[in-house]
């Protein structure tokens, strides 16, 4: 076997392994949150980025072996950004035989008109997109709207809300839409961004960059993303542990009086789950919760250097 054939064989092996992991992650998220049910018509929101391409690919793959029958329709919102390659998505989706709809709305013009030069456009752009996608879901008879946010997006949102909003609020894997008419799901909720990026590169998806918001410097989310990437590189398992913490909340050991009745604690009250930590320190496991090395090398642990968040 030639060296080129050997490399190709190894690349295919790694791609298969990566796809299986993504399939497993998506399958577990779907099962844990009951994202997809018998007869569902899933509107897959396709932006032309690595995340939405990967979501569509994995859902199509799972569709062949899922215990329930569901259909997919891909939807792209053409926001009329200058230089947007309108032909790429229709050609790609047609080649796959996937049902799709391209929605043309000049949200780019609205955002540029309303937002002063130098200010971030994400908030207004997101609101405009959301309303259009809800309307489109109704027109298509979709029962679920699938978005391509992954585990890293969810953690970034948690830290954004803690650092800047004073709230412990993330990005739910499943929720009711703002208009109360649609269920929104995030099938990639358990998937790592670095897995998605590697999968996207290996598959050669025709990526379309977002010129509206992707090039804005010093976004708060980008600062948080850089911090998390740094932690992931230097402290293997930290990201997994933090995400695991979002799934293991103990309201009695936080400070939110809406979540737990602290005033109702009296002599003779029942002991709450979580234990008594008034005098004893909680035992912390040596290995991070939820972390498995998989194929990632584990560099030596380092002392924490606190990053400055502005």
Swiss-Prot record:
SUPFAM superfamilies (alphabetical): Adenine nucleotide alpha hydrolases-like
GO biological process: tRNA thio-modification
The keyword Cell wall biogenesis/degradation appears for this protein: no
Compartment(s): Cytoplasm
NCBIfam families associated with the record: PRK10696.1 (NF007972)
HAMAP family reported for this sequence: TtcA (MF_01850)
Family annotation (PANTHER family): AMINOTRAN_5 DOMAIN-CONTAINING PROTEIN, SULFURTRANSFERASE-RELATED
Official protein name in the record: tRNA-cytidine(32) 2-sulfurtransferase
Organism from which the protein derives: Cronobacter sakazakii (strain ATCC BAA-894)
């Amino acid at each position: 076997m030639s060296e080129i054939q050997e490399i190709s064989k190894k690349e295919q092996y790694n791609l298969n392994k990566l796809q299986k992991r993504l399939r497993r992650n998506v399958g577990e998220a779907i099962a844990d949150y009951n994202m997809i049910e018998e007869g569902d018509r899933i509107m897959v929101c396709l932006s032309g980025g690595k995340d939405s391409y990967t979501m569509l690919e994995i859902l199509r793959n799972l569709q062949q072996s899922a215990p329930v029958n569901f259909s997919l329709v891909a939807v792209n919102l053409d926001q009329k950004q200058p230089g947007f390659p309108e032909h790429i998505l229709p050609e790609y989706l047609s080649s796959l035989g996937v049902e799709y709809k391209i929605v043309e709305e000049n949200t780019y013009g609205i955002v540029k008109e309303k937002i002063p030069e130098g200010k971030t456009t994400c908030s207004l752009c997101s609101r405009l997109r959301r309303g259009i996608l809800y309307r489109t879901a109704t027109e298509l008879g979709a029962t679920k709207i699938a978005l391509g946010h992954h585990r890293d997006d969810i953690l970034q949102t948690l830290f954004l809300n803690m650092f800047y909003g004073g709230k412990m609020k993330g990005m739910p894997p499943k929720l009711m839409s703002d208009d109360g008419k649609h269920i929104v799901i995030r099938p990639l909720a358990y998937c790592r961004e670095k897995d998605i990026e590697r999968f996207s590169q290996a598959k050669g998806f025709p990526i379309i960059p977002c010129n509206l918001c992707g090039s804005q410097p010093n976004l708060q989310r980008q600062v948080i993303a850089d911090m998390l990437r740094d932690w992931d590189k230097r402290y293997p398992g930290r990201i997994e542990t933090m995400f695991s913490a979002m799934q293991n909340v103990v309201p009695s050991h936080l400070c939110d009086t809406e979540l737990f009745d602290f005033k109702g604690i009296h002599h003779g009250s029942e002991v709450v789950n979580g234990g008594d930590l008034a005098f004893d320190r909680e035992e912390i496991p040596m290995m991070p919760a939820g972390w498995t090395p998989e194929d990632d090398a584990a560099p030596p642990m380092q002392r924490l250097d606190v990053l400055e968040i502005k």
